[in-house]
Amino acid sequence: MKSILTEYLEICVICGRQSEAEHHLVFGTYGRELSEKDGLKIPICNNCHNMGEVIRKIHGNPMAEKLSKIIGQLAWEKEYALQKADEFGRIINENEKEDSIKKIINTGARESLRKRYGCSFL
């Protein structure tokens, strides 16, 4: 599994137990395949994913589903901004890194996500 959100792929990001599944942060007909390519997945146990109580699982819980999509979008935008900053040599040193990322996100990352996934969650 590839994830741009965590390097700890064997641990459920919600509860800390052993992961048993992958949750695609942008899912549905328009997003699952792209989420796979882009690393917009998190390791998760079955209870936190889709088998536990409604208020403790992602699927079947509209608020949790929406938040997972927002988290996925923010992670994608940051990754996009870092790639663009490297491409254009905009990151000169660590002190300027955060400002550069914010500028790139504000000037294209969100629109690029909208074009890639067909929607935006923010």
PLM region spans:
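Extended charged
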Residues: 1-18, 36-38, 42, 46, ...
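Short recognition patches in nucleic-acid-associated and regulatory proteins
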Residues: 19-33
